[in-house]
């Protein structure tokens, strides 16, 4: 591809509009961290409850999956706010 083709393609393409702006991502990272800690700590409390083993396993699995999803989102938001764009 020649420079002229690349230049023409660059200027004819649509400008990129981010879904979540970079200036709000640190706020989402902090909120995600709080939610992650709350959900994962409630998963640990669910294990210590006096209910049946199957019920504890079910609640622990659900809460740990939700906590892991929030931990992943928090990692992406935190790394983007430090300038490592994921």
UniProtKB/Swiss-Prot annotation:
Disulfide bond residue pairs: none
GO molecular function terms listed in the Swiss-Prot or TrEMBL record: structural molecule activity
GO biological process: protein N-linked glycosylation
Membrane topology: Multi-pass membrane protein
Record pathway: Protein modification; protein glycosylation
Keyword Endoplasmic reticulum applies: yes
Keyword Transferase: no
Sequence similarity: Belongs to the OST5 family.
Summary of subunit composition and partner proteins: Component of the oligosaccharyltransferase (OST) complex, which appears to exist in two assemblies comprising OST1, OST2, OST4, OST5, STT3, SWP1, WPB1, and either OST3 or OST6. OST assembly occurs through the formation of 3 subcomplexes. Subcomplex 1 contains OST1 and OST5, subcomplex 2 contains STT3, OST3, and OST4, and subcomplex 3 contains OST2, WBP1, and SWP1.
Other observations noted: Present with 1010 molecules/cell in log phase SD medium.
Name of the protein this chain belongs to: Dolichyl-diphosphooligosaccharide--protein glycosyltransferase subunit OST5
